[in-house]
Amino acid sequence: MIACLSLNPCWDKTMTVPQFFLDAPNRVQTLRADVGGKGVNVARAAAALGAECCLVGQDYQGAPVAAAMAREGVACYLRPAPGEMRVNLKIQDQAAGRTLEINESGPLADGELLPAMKALLLAHCPAGGWAALSGSLPQGLPPESYALLTAALKAAGVHVAVDCDGAALERAVEAGPDVIKPNAQEFQRLTGVNPLDRAAALAACRALHGRGVGLICLSLGAAGALLSLPEAAYSCQAPRVPVRGLQGAGDSMLAGLLTALARGLEPAQALAFASAAAGASVQREGTLLCRRADVEKLLPGLRVEKIRL
């Protein structure tokens, strides 16, 4: 079982315009709206890859989170929340080949949110299962929120993966999560190290292992990915695919990694599966995520190399 936490779900709205102009009307060419947020995306991608998973989180008034997830075979355990679900807007400028992102913060969390999420996670993620704690924290929650949940879950025998940024990630590291999955920018903010400097990045990973982090999956976009364990490290090139949408690639990578680990795959195999999932995601437009058939097509073309430490 992979239980995916979604503290701050959203509407993911993606618009395309022929050319984006400031101080002038912009006519929308296409519009797509999906229920999203990192936790939702990880659950959707994991389900698409065949994993047994569920979504734990908040359900805002008028937000069809449960209905959307049910269509994809994901069980939901949601706590009713006041307010409206936030909107993440992406405007794709076709002429420039660039995307403008505008993300709302979302409603203020109440004091009962964290205890409620802890209880739901412990109730629906058995010992030996995985919990994925990902995404931004709602306003009102302290930065140590993921650290507190990590400690409680690990004490119950649950494996924990954390995918977040900034102070929340810094605090979570202190609780010794089994997996973290930073991208290049998040890794640099966490460690102060350029992730493209492999020797320095691996040294920073070893320091994180020394603080209790089990496995580090460092996603580097077109430069591929690194997987670091206390005793070994691996690299994998990025799949060669047409890039149609970057949104959700990291969530697909985490879903692929956890699906592989839950199936008992070795680390090198898990990295290949995660990289294929990310590649399968970027070749789809907007907020569409990976598909199992695409992952299986990409896997044979990926080569994982063990890095000499």
Label each residue range with its predicted role.
Residues 1-23:
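Positively charged, low-complexity intrinsically disordered leader regions
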Residues 27-85, 298-301:
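Substrate-binding N-lobe of the ribokinase-like
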Residues 44, 89-91, 224-228:
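Short beta-strand scaffold segments in enzyme catalytic cores
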Residues 143-231:
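Conserved phosphate/ATP/ADP-binding segment of small-molecule kinases
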